[in-house]
Amino acid sequence: MSEFIAFVAEKSGIKKPNLIEKDLIIHRILRDIYSSRHFAENYLFKGGSCLVKCYFGYYRFSVDLDLTWQAQEVWAGLGKYELRRCLLEEIGNFGSSLEKIAQDAGLEFKNELKSKKYFEFGGGSRMVTFKLWKDSELIKIQVNFVDEILFPDKTITVKTLLENVQLSRDDTAYFEEALEFYRPFKVKVYDEKEILCEKVRAILTRRTQKLRDFYDLFMLYKSGYKIEALKEQIIVKIKACLHYRRYRANLERNRKSLEFSAVTEDPFERELFVTKPPKDFDAFLERLPGALREIMNQV
């Protein structure tokens, strides 16, 4: 693996081996998830990882995966206990497949729903974080099983750091096994507008904001997707998550004080950046609190 990491670093021109390794791992996990027909048909790829690997290219690294169950209609009309039973059945199916995927990738994960080491539940099992481990390093796969999906999904190719790199025949032969899992493939994904709505929701319902979310919003803004144009949809998204107690508490906390200064200097978050944000990123950050407060005032 270390030799292939060095190869990707050389070919991509990005000298961040630890983050390259993380990209190889999450790419393999995602590919293996979507190699299952059931998962490929029923789960949508989303979030910052989706923006990087499907839409805008590697302006930053991602260190986790976010998915949503697409067929929300299957939960409609179910009572509280029947819904929980059905959710736990699907969570168990996903966890069982993930256990094999993790084993094949040399990661630690056990499909033990009662284990806090491997599972974190929210909202009566409506949202689950599956926690995979590479030694002491955590790789999170967060799945929203119940949520509002407002825009039609798309089918897009998941790219790698070797996109647009011409590989020689010798390179292809030498790294044949690694290139077999680190190659492009197609997935169903969230529309950019849906991702923007959830990015704003994440910022407003987290106890601590993350600089990567601001950079993602900036990239969406530069591509023509603006918070002001999607206020109604963002509010719908926020209201859909308010049955999570901690999100309600965080929203109230952020309503009283929305402070970005400490976030923008976080060295870990800065290390995720592949390219330094342009100067207008700072101007974007200065305008952002006003737009966010306007939304909070309407929730």
Give residue spans per PLM region.
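Glycine-rich beta-strand-to-loop/alpha-helix junction loops that act as flexible
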Residues: F45-S49
